[in-house]
Amino acid sequence: MTSQRLPTGGDVRISNEDGRVAAVLVNGGTAKPVPGTWSATSELLVRELAPRFPAIRFVEVRYRLKSWRALDSCVADGRAALAAAGRATTLLIGFSLGGAVAVRLAATESVTGVLGLAPWLPSELALDGLRGKRLDIVHGTWDRHLPGIPGVSPANSRAGWERARRLGVPGTYTVIPRGLHGCALRSRRGGLVRLPHWRDWVAATAATLEELAG
């Protein structure tokens, strides 16, 4: 794994540098703009899946500021990460707030689709950039509205997915029974705490990556 500072001031971590296609993982945030951190959910997914998919270059993004109030800043970091990924075929994986970030970036030529993991898809979010792409969503049934991130719930992401379907965007919607918000948290010591049903999140993500890897 290598780390790289983006021109925007954000950061990326890259696994499987020689992969011929890319998966760019954009993460969540809070209401108050705070310095970005590495996503525990993204880190666990890459740890589990990078060895299984050597053909995929995994690019994790750390925003300068992680907040839905700084969405434009997060999108700029994501766009810089797509450039750093440097592949003609790229899947965007957006967790929580990252769902909106990924949708905002979907029109990028190299992007073939978006995989939203418990994504934040507010009703005012324009989905036109998804035309000609895919939108697949995975959400835990026990996820609920979180402080600082209005609208993160299975009902919200389902509504966003159905809006995309009405635009002719193909994709699947998968629920994880009793699944929470993502598959991991960060411990006080910096390690990963795996949430219940984390294997289901890994399996659902792997199913989409199978198509990407070809």
Spans of features found by a protein language model:
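Active-site-adjacent alpha-helix of alpha/beta-hydrolase-fold enzymes
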Residues: T37-E48, W142-G171
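A conserved short beta-strand
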Residues: S110-L121
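Hydrolases whose catalytic domains are alpha/beta-hydrolase-1, hotdog thioesterase
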Residues: V101-L105, L125
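Gly/Ala-rich beta-loop-alpha elbow adjacent to hydrolase catalytic centers
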Residues: I93-A102
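Alpha/beta-hydrolase active-site loop
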Residues: S67-A85, W201
